[in-house]
Amino acid sequence: MPIPRPLLVLALLLTLAFAARVAHADCIADAADRHGVNGDVLRAIGWQESHLQPAAVGHNANGTLDLGAFQINSIHLPELARHGIGATALADGCVSAEVAAWHYRRQVDRWGNTWAAAGAYHSRTHALAAGYANRIAAILMRWKLMPPGPPPFAATEAQAPDPPRQPPPFTGAYEVLPFVPTAR
């Protein structure tokens, strides 16, 4: 008995959706590896920012835009432009993951491999960064990639991280990569 056409179409769409999700996940893991950051934290950042929607655009009260799956703020566009990345390129999930890994690496270099660095991906204001880090930790706990426990920052914690170190310049590593992710 032949399989009904609507069922075949549904199966094909589900297969393509799964393949796209796996490819996108590989972009995240590859970018994290290249920049030496935690891939699970990077993926959780993308989930927090846009649920990994590549074409996401956020409008901020200060007039800036957050672009792509990792919501890269438009204040970074002049520096990214020096490396050939424009606003529209950030709608490519792999480019967005690469830029996010670079930005997160800058925070790790500044604050150390800490929750303060994860929070600083979002904001340099300690209270906002602490809340963001707690949300990233909650995502990792939900995904069972981190044991359940109290949030990294208590609600009343007011101490700031150590003074910042100078972040490294963008390496432009994406330029030598094809935008077709490799299978793991």
Region spans (language model):
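Catalytic glycan-binding domains that act on GlcNAc-containing polysaccharides
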Residues: A23-T156
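N-terminal secretory targeting signals
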Residues: M1-D26, D30, R34-H35, A138-R184
